[in-house]
Amino acid sequence: MSYTLDEVAFLRENAAAIDTAAADLEGTKKAHLRDVAKLQAHFGDYGRAVAELIQARSSGKLPGQWLMDHDSAQQATPPAVAAYRAQFLQERNVDLVHDLTCSIGTEGQAFAPGTYVGSDLDASRVAMAQHNIEHPVFRADALTTTTTAQVCIADPARRQGGNRITRLDQLLPPPADLLATHGEMAIKCAPGIDHSEWDGLACVVSLDGGVKETCLYTRGLGAGKRAVILNTMPEGLHTDVIEDDLDEDELPEAGPMGRFLIDPDGAIVRAGLVRHYAAREGLHQLDPRIAYLTGDRLPHGTSGFEFIEMVPMKKLKAAMAAHDVGSLEILVRGQDVNPDQLRKKLKLKGSTAKTLVVTRIGTKGVAVLCGPRVVSTEGNYAP
C-alpha cells in the first residue's frame, strides 16, 4: 500500500525513532501482528506506514536508510542491474539520462552527479526518491517532454488485470507512445517479453542465476541481441556478456550426448543466444528446439550434470532401482511432466543422489539420467 505525502514526510522526519523502534521488534511472521500493534501504539496513525517501511526494508536489497513501500521495494531494479545499464550508457558517451518512471530512485544511485534526472507520476514515490538519491527528481507524466536528456529510461507497467504482459504493444504506456515523445530510449521490460520485432538492442540480464529484466535499447544505442550474466563473487561483481556476433555457419548443430549436460543461464535462453554461447564454450544442443547443451567439459564458473544414461520413460522405475537412486532432482523442458508427481510415482528406495532431465529429442520424449549437480572450478572440470 502506498503512502500519502504526509506519511512520507513523517517517515523522513522520524528516521532515528523508527530505527530504534525497529530494533525492538520480534521481526518474525508469527509475531507480525504484535509488532504492528506495538508500532501503532508508539506512532499512532502513522504506525501502519512505519510497519510497512520496516517490512519493505527487511529484504536488504536496497540501502537501509532508504524510504520505500512494499510495492516499490518489490519492483525495484536490483542495484547491480542498474549499475550495468549506467555503465552501458556511459560507454556510449551519454552525458545526461532522464528516468521517466524513477519510482523511489533505484536507477539513480548508479549515476554520477549531474548525469541523471528522475521523474514519476506518483507524488509519494517522487518524495521518497528525493530523500533516497542526490539527483533532481520531480513529478511528471512519462509521455511529456520535460528535459533535454540524450537518453530516457522507462519502466512501463508489466501487468494488466493481474496478468503478466508478454507483448510490447500491451505495455503501459506502449513503447510506440514513448518513442513518439522521446528520442533514444532504454525501455525496461519483464524477462519474458516478446522482443523478436524490436528494431534496436534486446538485452536480457540475469543476476546470481535469476533473470531480472529485458531492456530494449533504441537503434542509436545498439542492435541485435545480448545476454548479460551478473554474478556476485567474493571479489566483487563478475559480468559475462554473450552477443549475436556470429554467422549462422559458425554456430554448432545439434549432436550426441557428451560427458556433461548443461542448463544455460536463463538470460542466454531468453535472449535466444543458446547456440552462440555453445559456440563460445565448445558445446552443442541435443535438439535444436531445446536449450539444454552438452559437451565434454563444464564452462568455468557454471554447473551441470555428468551423464549416466538415456532411459526410456517406460523404464524409469527399473533404472532408478539399478542405480540405487534415493533422491532425485528432476528438471523438465519441452515435456508436460510434473516433477513432484513423477518422483512419487517412481517410489525411490535407494541411497544415492541423481538428477533426471526430462526433455525432448526430435519427436520423442526422453529421460536423461545424470549424477548430482557439480560446479566447475579451476581444479575441477574447467580447462
Predicted feature residues:
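SAM-dependent transferase fold signal centered on methyltransferase-like domains
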Residues: 1-383
